[in-house]
Amino acid sequence: MSTHFQTAVKKRVSHTHRRDAIDRLIERGERTNLALLVRTSGLDGEFRRYALNGLAECNGREQLEELADNTTIEPSLRRRADDLR
């Protein structure tokens, strides 16, 4: 796991630092880690959606397809993944 991923999932991280960490994942094209953030149920929905949108930015079509079909994540996230792919 990258340092940026670890920052994104830590419990006591400021909103700004968490968003910055997700931005770094997007910039580096870390699609697997972004998809994992979307699946992380302990993470606020705002950040899960941000990671989902980041997948679209870094051409994560394969991950978006997988997330759209994944029944273990919230239906709203699945619908958004389907829209983005």
Language model: regions and residue ranges:
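N-terminal "cap/leader" segments of large eukaryotic alpha-helical scaffolds
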Residues: 1-12
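A general marker of short, structured functional hotspots
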Residues: 1, 43-46
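Structural detector for internal amphipathic alpha-helices that build alpha-solenoid repeat scaffolds
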Residues: 7, 16-28, 36-39, 46-60, ...
